[in-house]
Amino acid sequence: MGRILAYSLILLALVSCGTGRKTAVTDSKEPASVQMRVGSYNLWRPGPRDDGYAWDVRKFRLAKTIAEIGFAVFGVQEFDTVIQNDLPGLVEKEGGNYEWFIFSPYNKEGGAGPKAQGIVYRKNRFTMLESHHFWLSPTPDVKSKGWDERKYTRGACCAIFKENATGLRFFLMISHMPLGKEANANAAPVILERAKEYNPESLPSFFVGDLNTREWTKSSELFRTYWNDTFLTVPADVRKGSVGTFNKRGENEDMNAAPRIDYIYYRGEGVKPLGYTCDNRRYEGYYPSDHCPIYADFIVTLPLVSTEGR
C-alpha cells in the first residue's frame, strides 16, 4: 500500500505542476526532473491486402495513434521503405513533431533500407548526441545472420540524447530480436554487452522493442539482471490496457491471454516509472498494426552540471 501511495503522490505532484519539469538553473544544487513518455511500436510491414488492414487504409490510423499518444521518444520496428516514405509526413499532419532515425540491418552501412527499425524523438525537445548500430550475430560489427535465425537479418541500434531545456542526457537502445529460440537467447548477451559499451557514463538507460520473447525466457531473465521490466515494476493500478501486446491483426481476441513480446526496460537511480500502457485502440474494429503500441511515463532526475566558464 505504501508503494502505491508513493506512486500516487508523485503522479499528483506532476499533474499539479503542469509539465512536471522543474526549471533548470545553472549551478543550482537542486536536481532537474524531467518527465518523458518512452515507448515502442511494431508498425507491421505492408503487404498485399484489400481489407481494413491494407496500408493505404491503416496508415492514417497509425499516424493518428502515434500523434495522440504523444511519445517523447520511442522505438519502431518493421519500419519498411513504404512506411518510411509515408508515415513521418502523416504524423506531422496530425501534429507530431518528430525526427526519425533509421537503421536497416539489411544495409551493410547501417543506414536506411528495408525491414528497418528506428528511434523516433521530438526534434524540438531532444538532440541526438551520438548513435550506434550492430547486428545480432556472432559477428555483430558486420551485416550478418546468427544461429538459428535463417530468414531475417536482425540488429539493434542505440543513441545518447540530451534534453535541450535541462541538459539531462539519457541512453536508449531498440531492437527487433530474432524469432529463433537459439538466436534470441544468444542475441541477448550481445545486446547487454553493447548497452554497457555505448553507455560508459551509466546514464539513465532504456531498452525497448519487439523482443520476440516472453518474460520467463533466458533472454528476459538476462535483461532483468541489468534493466527493470516496466510492466513488472509498476503497481497494478497504474498499468493500463492489456497484458498481451501482439494482437495478430485482431485474431487474438483475448488480449490479456495474448503474448507480451514488446517491452520497455529502464535502468538508473534517477529513473522512476509512473505508469505503463498497452494501447488497444481500434478504428472501426481494426487495429493500426498487428502489435499494440506500448508506452510508459518516467520521471528522470539528475543533478545539473555547472556550465559556467565553458
Positions of predicted regions on the chain:
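N-terminal, active-site-proximal structural segment of metallo-dependent hydrolase catalytic domains
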Residues: 15-92, 105-114, 299-310
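Metal-dependent phosphoester-hydrolase catalytic domains
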Residues: 22-27, 182, 193-205, 213-310
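Active-site-proximal beta-strand elements of phosphoester/diester hydrolases
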Residues: 35-48, 130-134, 168-178
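Catalytic metal-binding/acid-base residues of hydrolase active sites
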Residues: 44, 80, 176-178, 211-214, ...
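Active-site neighborhood of phospho(di)ester-bond hydrolases with catalytic His/Asp-centered motifs
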Residues: 75-77, 103-104, 206-210, 229-233
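Structured beta-strand-rich core segments of catalytic domains in phosphoester-bond hydrolases
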Residues: 77-169, 277-278
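His/acidic metal-ligating clusters that form di-metal
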Residues: 153-175, 183-221
